[in-house]
């Protein structure tokens, strides 16, 4: 299965999230990827793409909570 191309806006959100994540700004990465996730859902993208981004969001949330030494979810 081949992923559908991202729109320009979606590509920006993916890259913004990656840069935030790489710089330890996990909450900002979470927010950027959540916007991407919502965009993918609105245009009925493949479920595998939606779930991949959902996994990125969950990973960012986990690391954000770890960074804050919070033992419970967001």
What are the language-model segments listed below?
Residues 47-48, 72-74:
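Acidic/polar-rich alpha-helix caps and helix-coil junctions
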Residues 19, 57, 64-65:
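Residue-level signature for tetratricopeptide repeat
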Residues 31-57:
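Short, charge-rich amphipathic alpha-helical segments embedded
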Residues 21, 26, 33-34:
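Inward-facing hydrophobic residues that define packing positions of alpha-helical scaffold repeats
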Residues 1-11, 47-49:
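TPR-adjacent "capping" and linker segments in tetratricopeptide-repeat scaffold/adaptor proteins
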